[in-house]
Structure formats: structure tokens, C-alpha cells
Amino acid sequence: MKPFYSMSLVLFLVITLLPKPMFPQVATGTTGNVIRVGFIHCRDFQSAPITVGYRTSAAAASIAVDRLKRENLMSGWEFNFTIEFDDCVESEAAGMTVDLIEKHNVDVIIGPTMNQPTLAAFIVSNYFNRPIIAWGLVNAAQLDDFERFPNAGILSAGQRSLGVAIRAVLKRYEWSQFVYAYFTEEDTEKCVTMRNDLQQVVSYFGDIILAYSIQVADISNDGMIEALKKIQSRGRIIVTCMKDGIGLRRKWLLAAEEAGMIGDEYVYVFSDIKSKGYVVPLLGGGERPSWILSTGSDENDTRALKAFKQSIFICDMMGQGSIATNYTIFGQEIIARMKEAPYFCTKDCEGENFTVAATYAGQLHDAVYAYGVALDKMLKAGQIAQYRNATAFMRYFPQSFIGMSGNVTINEKGTRNPTLFLLALDENNNNTRMATIYVENMSATFNALYSDEGVMWASRKNNARPVDVPLCGFTGNLCPKSFVDEYLIWVIVAIVVLFLAITAAACGIYFSIQARRQEIERLNRLWQIPFIHLHQINSKQKGKGEHSVRSLQSGTSTLSSRTTVSFKTESRNFLFFSLQRESDYEPVVAKKHAYRPRLDDDKCTFMRSLRNLDQDNLNRFIGLCLDGPQMLSVWRFCSRGSIADVILKATIQMDNFFIYSLIKDMVHGLVFLHGSMVGYHGMLTSKCCLIDDRWQVKISNYGLQDLRSPEMYEKKDLLWSAPELLRAEDIKGSKEGDVYSLGIICAELITRKGVFNMEDRKEDPEEIIYLLKKGGLKSPRPDLEYDHTIEINPALLHLVRDCFTERPSERPSIETVRSQLRGMNSSRNDNLMDHVFNMLESYASSLEEEVSERTKELVEEKKKSDVLLYRMLPKTVADKLKLGQTVEPETFEQVTIFFSDVVQFTTLASKCTPLQVVNLLNDLYTIFDGIIEKHDVYKVETIGDGYLCVSGLPHRNGNEHVRQIALMSLAFLSSLQFFRVPHLPSERINLRIGMNCGSVVAGVVGLTMPRFCLFGDAVNTASRMESNGKPGKIHVSAEANRMLHLVGGFDTESRGEVIIKGKGVMETFWLTGQGTGAVSGARHVSAKKVSKKMDEIHRQETLKSDEQLSD
């Protein structure tokens, strides 16, 4: 073949000798509306019948005209065809072009179909400014030069589009560099042009590298192997260009296989415009695989197939890659219509080679159809007069439609935006389209047709995509050293460090587990209370945070109703202890549990969490005592008792705010409880709502549902339970049940009566529970009848009734109860403690006024106050205190201590008003004080109805102290014979007296209201003598008996051995009276006589005392 540029120069010289025609506005030489179309076909070229041959493609133009008519395009116009044959020779094509324009006066030229003839035709038509549209095998890059050929159209894919498509594939699979190998055998221009196009694309984008370009001039096996060896050291992605259909690809890949360059590392990229990929079209419509020679199969076919599987192919599928499904019918119509006008090809079109339409026949159809569409646009635009003017025509030529060669898009330059295809052999060796590549100018759109990229690399290990640069480089000398070789020392160090780290981690984990286990054991010990740490209250703890019983009795306020553990005795369900905490003692209450559950890990975790629950309105759970005779749950002791106690005693004047505050505290406790891991209380009663020193309600006995046993609850304890729980016999409870119980407790507070007012009901608890289980409209509920002197918010009454509604679903949640309570007292922010203080201040003020009136004379007269002070303290002590001097404690080696107590005073006081009690005691003590003044005895204090005296201090009197106390004791008993209670004349006062001798320490205690106090075991012994004595008798210790006999004049008799609390077994005596050796002048008094006279009274009081003790 001759070069294009030499041929173009010859054509230019020929054309310049021709006269340049003058183009009129209307086509000349035509009759009517006729479009003259000139065709330049290839008839006898060797491969023409398969691709663009006249006998297998020409009728496509007629089919296109028929389509224009069906679509009402160019209506009223006819098409006249003039056909010339250039036989794919450029000089013939140039001459035919001139002949068609000058001789036949055609309006447009369709063709030629080869590169060199098309170049000649473009040059001529450009000179005459006549439209020309090429198709078929036209793909030379020179023909895409818009500046050179602005008036020509091309319906086939251009060679330049291959470079853009190759870049798109490289970018898709992340290959940044490649090698280009090209063959010039029989077709020098195509591959050289493709090289130039690739270099232009690489330079334009700059994101890929053309690492090496090699021309394979020697196509022998050795020559190919030599070229491949050069490629091996420069790349693994090998783009190859060669002439199609002569077996070069097979030969090239077999040489690569022989050179060891067929494997997972290598990818051979074949690219061609005039190709169908891995198959070669044959005459008659057949195809043969590229790995099989045209001469037939041989022994290398299997090797060739394996090599072809390491390649991919970029081509246009000869214009049939995306054709319509009716292309077969289209091809059959072409063959049939070739025998009709205007072709009348009968004899020449016979034979097996002309039974199948040419592969590019669809492009001829699309070229004629595109020309008709453009003319129709000119017609409608009123530019039909310029239809032969190529410059005017090309403005209307860009368009898009679905043609017989697929989707056709003609750009502004008059060339078609091609659709290329990426092909690969699948597992079944089929020529498979893997992707479409739509090229538009210098850009390409890659659309994969697979869902899994692995199908692209099915012949490779793990279906893995190859890389453009091997791990070891192209020459193999860049392989990274093995980790062990390069870092052997570091590996050893790392192993040692790793071993040490693992060992340390294992040790850490072990010690962490051990520490965690020990921490859990420590936390478990916090709630597991040893029984040995629970102490009964005795005198040893009184000095460590506990007052004596007598001190509490004398110091207890009726308003405060405060008690300590010392007053509490064991009940059916509770025990009271002092919990030893190191050197301190804490008062606690222990609830008995008959059921001992198995404490697994979950229950132990729950107990730890339960102990950590801390809220102002929850009583603190201290723990469980598991090693005692009975399982006990230990709780903090609240000194003011429970709400039930407050209601029962009725000593507190509760107003609206007082009731509201107690209810609010209960609600806050339940809100916290319902939101905690405990969930609900289950057995909420007024007995387990305790009140602490600050008048704050604390809910107790929660969270131990698993320890509850039905037999531990009396019928009366179930009166707070909701009806649904009673019916189900569920002692664990529910949140709704807690709300019901809350309503019952609120009713108790409002009415100031016990649960269901059982004191005034005829029914017993069992009957009430039966009615509650039965339910219905007459199911019993507490009557909310309250003292109307107290202002109760009506909304509170409604809320309480809602709480003990029969249906659980209709009861308000505890959150709802809290929000409604807030609305009832939104204006007040006082707390209950402040309220109680205000009440106490008011009470104190009234008392102060009363005392002020009664003690006016004492205030007015200083002497009387001194007298009173001397009566309260010894004169020597009082004088020192008045002078501001410190009174040092003093030890008295031998004194006699006297204790007395009015028998059955509590019963007697219950029959009197407070004022009568005061008058009674005043009258009695006045008599006693008069007796004391006659003896050398110092009155230490009165403790309620008790009397404490001592002789032998503050003035020592040798052994006379025991005589003075004995005479005073006999005088006390004697004086009771004539004492009468004014308002109870039938009642008699009787005393229980105890005395003991020993050493004591005396001193003044306190700065505010100082008191002269006695300390020593002798005092406790005297107290035990009194408490273990009998009414109307003088109980004497062995030491006092010894001293009595020492001074003489008194009669005693042995009582025998008696068990004394805190002392053990002691022998004690009765002082029966005075003997013959008494001091002269002393009145003879017999304790026996006094006792005999009061024997009946004593017997009655003893019976009453026994009844109260049993209670």
C-alpha cells in the first residue's frame, strides 16, 4: 500500500486542473423532488464479501429509504441511486468521486468503505463542498481530522477511539503502566497510528505510563521470543496491535508461552476496530476461533487456547456488538432485495459466499438513514435549498438514533461516537463481552457487564486481578527479603518480648481474676454479717453511743417519741441488736427469715447491689446474717419507729403538711425502688415505713422477695396487699401492688387510725382478706373519714382512692402519683424537720411562759435561786462553780448508795392527768425530802419516779453512812402508811428500795446544766438491788449487810442467792428493821410491820406487773 500523503498530493494536482463548478441554490438537472445519492462500493476485493462487499450490503440503502418513508421523513421526496465501484483502490475512488459529482450530479456520496479510498474521496468532495459519508472499514486517524475534512461524515469507529478505550480499561483495573508491541506486517499505518494515538492519550491525561514501545519486525518464532524477552523486563500489561485474520495473534501467544510469559502475571491486551475479538468471520456467515488456524486444527491448539485465556480484547465487534434483535431479518432482507431494483443482482450474487449479509451492512443502512434525517431537519428549517452545500448540511448532521449497527450518536464533527467492547474468554471458552466502553472525543465511559470481576480472571489463581508491576519487579531482583532473613534478630527479640508480654498478660489476667475474686469476696463480706458481731444491748455498749435505760426514760420527750434499741425487745419477726463495727456499735434491727435460699453468684451479685442502694427515703440494707440459728436480714435502726407506731401512739399532732410530707417521702422512695434493679417492694406496709431522727420516712424490708415465706406473715400483715396478689397468693408482689399498699398507708395517715380501722370493726383480719379476695362492688376499702380540723386537700383523697382501685391497670403509676403530689403543694418548699422544729418552738414557748409564771418568785429572789442551787448540787461544789472554778472529780472510798422506785407507777400515771402526776410526785418527794433533811444523806437526783441518794459524800462520815441510809430507808417506808393520793384515795403508794456500799467517784459533768454525778460499780450494784427487789422491802447487798452488822442496831435476813443481771449469782439480804443496838433517840421502825400492812397492796401490784410483762 502507498502512503496516504503521497496519494493526497497527486489528487490535489489533478483536482486543481479541473474547473471549479458553480453551485446554484436549487439542484439542477433534476425533475421534481429527487435526491440523487451516489454510492462508491467495493465489489471484488478479497475480504469485501464478509465485511463491506457490494453483493452482501448494497440493499441496506433501500431498506433505510423505506424506514424514512415509514417514519414520514422527507415526505414527497424520492431517492435516486447511482452506484460506482472503486474495488478499494484510492485512485479509482478519487475518479469515481469526480465522476459522481460532475457527470451524475449527485447530491451526496455514501462511501467509500476503506481507509485509502476514503481519504481520496474526502479530498475531492471537500474541494466540491459536496456532502460525503463514509462507512465500513474506515478507521484511519487522518480521517478524523475535522479541520482538514469539516464536510465529511463517518459512521464507523475511528482508530483514535481505541487509545481512549485502552486508557479506560487500564484505569478500571488500576494498571498505571503498560508496554506497546506492534506489528507492521502487511499494515504499517494502522499500528503506527495506534502508537501515536496512545502516546497522545498518555500525554493528554498524564495518569498512565507507556513504559516501553517495540516494533516486532521479525514475525518468526525466534524474532517474537526475542521481542518478548525485551518486554519481560519492562512490563506485564502488554498492549498489542497486529493485522487481524492472518494468525499473528496465535503465533504471538505461542511464542509468549514458549518464552515463559504466559501466566498469572501477564495480561495481553489486543485491540482492533475491524475485529470480532476471539473469532474470525468466514464467508457464508461462519466463524472460527482465533486459536485455530485457517488451515485447520493442529497439535498447538490447546497451548494456544490456554495462552488466549491470559488475554483480553478491545474491539468494535465489527459494528454488531449492540445491534437490534432483528438484525438477522435485516440481513436476510438485504440478500433478498439485491435481486430487485435498482440492483438486479442475480447471477453475480449467487453462491455460498453471498448468502449472508456483510458484517458492516448495518452501517450503510445507518449512513443513508442519518442523511435522510439531516435532510428532513433542513427541510423543516427551510434550508432545503442548501442541501447540496456540505458546510450547511453538516450543521444538521449531528443526531442520535437506534440504527442497525446499534446506538448511533453523531457528534458535532460529523463522526460517530463509537461503542467498543471489552472481551474475554469465559470458563467455557466463549467469546464473552465483559464491558462496554462508550467513547466521546477524549473521554470514555466504562460499564461492566459482570456482577463479579472474578469472571474476568477465571483462568488465574483465585480469580485474582493481575498487577502491572510484580512484587519482585520486572527482573526479579526487587523481591523483598523474607521477614526472617531481614529481621532475624528483631524476630528473636520480638519473640522474647512477645513471650514476656504473653506471660505478663497471663499473669496480669490471673492476678486480675484473683483480685476480682478477692474484691467480690470482700464485697460479699460487707453484706454477710457474722452472728458474733450482733450483740444484745447491755451496759458495756451504753458507754459507746448508747444511753442507759433510766437516762432515756428521764430524757424522753413526749413530742419526739424517740426511742433507742435499748427499749426494743424481740418480737415475732424482728430482733434488735447492736452491730459491732471495729470499736463502735451501731443499732440495727434484724428481720427473721424462716426460708434459707441457695445463694448462687447471681444472688450474691444482687445482694451487693442491694447493699449499695442509697436514697434518702430507703432504709439502708446492711446485709444478711447466715451463720446464726436463723437467717436474718439486717437493716439500719430508725429511732422514731414506723408510721404504724406514730399512728398507734397518737402523740404527734399531725397537720396537713405533716401528712403530706410523710406521703411524699414514701412516694419518693417507691419511685427510686421501682426504677432500680429491685423493681418493686412487694410487701409494703405502714410497719416497714420507718421514721428516722430527722422525721424522714425510710422504706425498709425491700428487695428480699426470695427470702419471704407465707407462714411468717400473720393475716393482719396481709391487709396491705392488693386483691390480685391475695388471690394469687403471691408474696413477691408487683409495682401495681405497691401503689395499692401506698394508698392503704395514706388512708392510715389521713384518718389517724390503723389499717382498715380494725379496732372499731366487727370483722377480723381473716374476714377482711376473704372479702378482698372476693372483690366486687362491696369489696372493703378504708374509710377516709378524718378530723376536719385538719385541712386535707380533696385532690389527695381522690388520689388515695385511685391508688387502691380494684383493677391494677386503673391504678396510677408511682410516677403519676409523684407528679400529682407536686401539684398539691407547689407553693411550699419547707421540709418536715423545719415544720417539727416550729412545732417544738411553739411548744417550748408555751412551756417557757408556764414555767416563768410558776417560778416568778425564784427569778425575783436571788437567795431562793441559791437555795435551789444548793439543793441541786452540794454547797461546796455550787460555791466553786459560782466562782468559776473547776470542780475536780473526787474518789470516796466508802459510801452507801440508795435507789428507790415507785411500784406500778406507769399504771398509776395512766390514771392521772400530767398535772396530777406532777402534784403526786411533788407531794411524795416533799415528804421524802423532809426525811432526807433529818439524816446525813445527799440527794443526787430524781429519775422520774426513781430516787437516788448517797451518804458519805460530799462530807465523809466514817462508817456512819450505812446507818444513815438504813434509817432513811425505813423512814421512807414508814411515811407511806399515811400518804394518800388526793384524786385517787383508794390507791396506795409502795416503794422498791435497794442499797449497796462501796467506793465511787463523784464529780460535776457538763458546763450547761451541770450535774453532780456518781460513777462506779457500786452505783450499778445498788441499782440492781432496787430492780431485783420486791415492793415494800429494802434489798441489801452483801457488802451493805456487812457494814450494817459492823455498825450494829439493824436486823437483816438472808434472801439467798439471786441471779443479778451483769453480776451473776449473788447472795443478798433484806433489811427488816432496827435492832437493839440502834442509835439512841432513833425511832424504832420495823420493815416487817410496814410490809405486813402493805402486803395486800403489794400482791395486787405484783399481779398487774406480771400482766404487763407478759404483754
From Swiss-Prot:
Gene3D superfamilies linked: 3.40.50.2300, Nucleotide cyclase (3.30.70.1230), Transferase(Phosphotransferase) domain 1 (1.10.510.10)
Source lineage: Eukaryota, Metazoa, Ecdysozoa, Nematoda, Chromadorea
GO biological process assignments: cGMP biosynthetic process; chemosensory behavior; chemotaxis; intracellular signal transduction; receptor guanylyl cyclase signaling pathway; response to magnesium ion
Membrane topology of this protein: Single-pass type I membrane protein
Protein name: Receptor-type guanylate cyclase gcy-7
Enzyme class, spelled out: lyase
This enzyme's EC code(s): 4.6.1.2
Tissue note: Expressed asymmetrically in ASE left (ASEL) sensory neuron. Expressed in excretory canal cell.
Ranges where the Protein kinase domain occurs: 536-838
Glycosylation-annotated residues: N80, N300, N326, N353, N389, N407, N430, N441
Spans through the membrane: 489-509
Binding site for ATP: K542, G543, K544, G545, E546, H547, S548, V549, R550, K568
Protein task: Guanylate cyclase involved in the production of the second messenger cGMP. Unlike other guanylate cyclases expressed in ASE neurons, may not play a role in chemotaxis responses toward salt ions in ASEL (ASE left) sensory neurons.
PANTHER family: GUANYLYL CYCLASE (PTHR11920), RECEPTOR-TYPE GUANYLATE CYCLASE GCY-7 (PTHR11920:SF495)
